[in-house]
Amino acid sequence: MTTDDDLAARTGQALTRRGWRLISAESCTGGLLAATLTEIPGASDWFEGAFVTYRLSAKTAMVGVSPALLDRHGAVSEPIARAMAEGALANSDADIAVSITGIAGPDGGDVLSPVGTIWFGWAIREDTGIQCVQTAEHHLSG
């Protein structure tokens, strides 16, 4: 079984091979991704930092998510995961960003986004600007 530390170390190795630095924008995880990554020796070579944007106002203030976008789609949605990743990259010197927004529970879910709904976003900086933005939705249980 792969542990969080194994995944974090492999992430660091892949980033090091490419000469990239990672930034995260986290909501429901409250900085857990950043904490896990920084436990790896040498993480300062490839980990830029983290924006912990638990509240809606933090998403706006820290990574520039539009209040109108939040009103239109809600905090747990594909457009917000995308905007968080793009905003983290735009507000840092990192090469790649990952965002996480979701409903950890035990309350707060609804029919469209039940507890356990998580959206991830990734954005990569290229010579022409922020490119290659991708998102993925997952539903976790327990």
Question: Would you name each region that the model predicts?
Answer:
Residues 1-142:
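Short alpha-helical segments enriched in small residues
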